[in-house]
Amino acid sequence: MGGVLSYFRGLLGSREMRILILGLDGAGKTTILYRLQVGEVVTTIPTIGFNVEQVTYKNLKFQVWDLGGQTSIRPYWRCYYSNTDAIIYVVDSADRDRIGISKDELLYMLREEELAGAILVVLANKQDMDGCMTVAEVHHALGLENLKNRTFQIFKTSATKGEGLDQAMDWLSNTLQSRK
């Protein structure tokens, strides 16, 4: 297991937690999934459908679902919402042209009753790219300041470099632990 996964082993109870990784196509969802699972970047192709992996962080078991982000696939995200403990929403911080679409998809998803209690982790990904939006810009562009009754946090990440993922997963695990 990668460093991030072994880092979480023993932290929480043994109940399997259901995590969805969502976001537009090309945001870095699959790269993040496998960076968390094996601790390194693997070659990926666009996800048509989903990838699902079982991962263990310390004592907490995760069933992590990486759902494709193409326009034609997004309507099917709702088929996976049931019993979700947390959502990792990945944003391509370098894609200024589609940040409005990302906001619309995020807000549409968060209106779903099945996700009412799910923790939200927003990853402002691709922070290593020139001209990318800052975390504050992504926060504002997504309208996160308007979220009410939702436990959430945003993190600056670079999936390819592995930056920021430990902090995000540490916050998520601590937040899940506090709900036990």
Swiss-Prot record:
One of its GO terms (biological process) is protein localization to Golgi apparatus. GTP binds at residues 23-30, 66-70, 125-128. GO terms for cellular component: cytoplasm; Golgi apparatus; presynapse; trans-Golgi network. It comes from the Eukaryota. The gene is Arl1. PROSITE patterns: ARF (PS51417). Pfam families: Arf. Belongs to the small GTPase superfamily. Arf family. One of its GO terms (molecular function) is protein domain specific binding. Keywords: GTP-binding, Lipoprotein, Myristate, Nucleotide-binding. SMART domains: ARF (SM00177), RAB (SM00175), SAR (SM00178). It comes from Drosophila melanogaster (Fruit fly). This is ADP-ribosylation factor-like protein 1. A lipid is attached at residue 2 (N-myristoyl glycine). CDD domains: Arl1. The lineage of its organism: Eukaryota, Metazoa, Ecdysozoa, Arthropoda, Hexapoda. InterPro entries: P-loop_NTPase (IPR027417), Small_GTP-bd (IPR005225), Small_GTPase_ARF (IPR024156), Small_GTPase_ARF/SAR (IPR006689). GTP-binding protein involved in protein trafficking; may modulate vesicle budding and uncoating within the Golgi apparatus.
